[in-house]
């Protein structure tokens, strides 16, 4: 029996790499049903101020094809509490590179108050979509 019934994680999943796969695998190891929110192009433009290399519809298909993923939903907002109200997960998974940030401290308190655990998973060192993009651009 896994620790959580429904888990949730989110990401852009642009230029899909081993770090993305590791987060999805580690999350699935802890929950029976893993829901993954894939950030829409509009959301990425709003908070990262750049357009993903891979279009949203293709990123959705890539994530849906991963065996650790049970369900994929569009992430149209950074509001994790609103996502909980819609999806009713009992754990939310994030890379530990977010741990301690003001935004995540606040949302962790709100989610804990309704019985949701925020689980930080070890970030895969040395790999990121930003670094891959820089290499492709010759930086």
Model-predicted segments: where are they?
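Nucleotidyltransferase catalytic core that binds NTPs
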Residues: 1-139
């Amino acid at each position: 029996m896994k620790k959580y019934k429904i888990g949730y994680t989110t990401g852009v999943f642009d230029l899909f790499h081993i770090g993305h796969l590791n987060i999805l695998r580690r999350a699935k190891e802890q929950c029976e049903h893993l829901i993954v929110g894939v950030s829409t192009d509009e959301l990425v433009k709003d908070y990262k101020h750049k357009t993903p290399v891979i279009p949203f519809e293709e990123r959705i298909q890539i994530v849906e094809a991963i065996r650790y993923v049970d369900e994929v939903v569009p992430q149209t907002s950074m509001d994790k509490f609103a996502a909980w109200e819609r999806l009713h997960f009992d754990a939310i998974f994030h890379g530990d590179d977010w741990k301690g940030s003001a935004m995540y401290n606040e949302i962790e308190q709100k989610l804990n108050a309704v019985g949701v655990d925020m689980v930080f998973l070890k970030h895969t060192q040395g790999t990121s979509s930003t670094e891959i993009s820089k290499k492709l651009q010759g930086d």
